[in-house]
Amino acid sequence: MNHLRFLHYVDEVARTGSVRQASERLHVAPSAVLRRIQDIEDELGTAIFERLPRGMRLTAAGELFIHYVRTSSADLERVRSEIEDLQGLRRGSVRLVVSQALAPTFLPKVVASFRERHTLVGFQIRVTDHVQALSALRNFDTDLALIFNLADESDLERIVELEQRLCVIMHRDHPLAKVPGPLKLRDCADYPLVMPNREIGGRQLLDRFLSRRSFRLQPVVECNSFEFLRGYLQYEQALSFQISVGAVNDGGPFASRDIEDRSFPKGKLALAALRGRQLPVIAYSFIEHLKLELERAAVEHGT
């Protein structure tokens, strides 16, 4: 299927905006990339790239063509998956973008348990925010997105949604870890707070609630990495916040407590795909597995 390989040349130039960078990623000569682009433009009878002093940019016709390229590539992966399914191989790859809150604990367990039954299946997972998740879905860079507070978009199909509370996270030696039951946000005001950046969905949920309250929570550290925030809790008697599916009460170094403030809002964790897109067979199997794990998590955390 050399023609699909040559279409991949075009896709790489579109992504990088540079023939040189695309050729380096493809491990071919720049002249080979340019030759294939010229062949396609001759066949279409129009330019698909503008040649700029500092790179290449898709024309309007190029935007249409690149959508065809990416759709064709995704369809080929689906057909390969279906053929392998007919042969009983159950192999292939699942591509997934996820909110950062899911990366440390929840998702590794889900993927590992799926691979116990499907050892030939690989995963390509990218941690991202909801804006980049939308882009990845629309550009066929991913099969699925598992994102907290995903924006409503007409071209997305929400396969499953799960309500999520915000929890307080602390080291197990923290004084509040010895307090049984839920906490009020005012209980947190007496301790240093290490919080996600304002671009993180859980932080936005918290800020909206506090904007209607008479007290404020002032973080001493803000970071867009949950790994860093958890790591920091080992060195100071500080508190952080996390959605319930990412909370930990497994006897490890961290503990979590629910927030019991009246009218405290919940967000939604959504598993989504591009509406109308046919996914690889193995992706549908993973969806069913993920649904069960999300339902189990909802029962465990009482959401």
Predicted regions and their residues:
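Secondary-structure junction motif
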Residues: 183, 192-213, 279-288, 294-302
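Flexible hinge/capping segments at coil-to-helix
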Residues: 156-166, 170-193
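Central regulatory/effector-binding core of bacterial HTH transcription factors
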Residues: 91-154, 223
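Short helix-boundary/capping micro-motifs
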Residues: 11-29
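Conserved amphipathic alpha-helical core elements
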Residues: 40-41, 114
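A late-sequence structural motif
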Residues: 106, 257-300
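A short LG(V/I)-centered, amphipathic sequence patch enriched
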Residues: 15, 41-58, 63
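Hydrophobic hinge/microswitch elements
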Residues: 129-134, 138-142, 147-148, 201-257
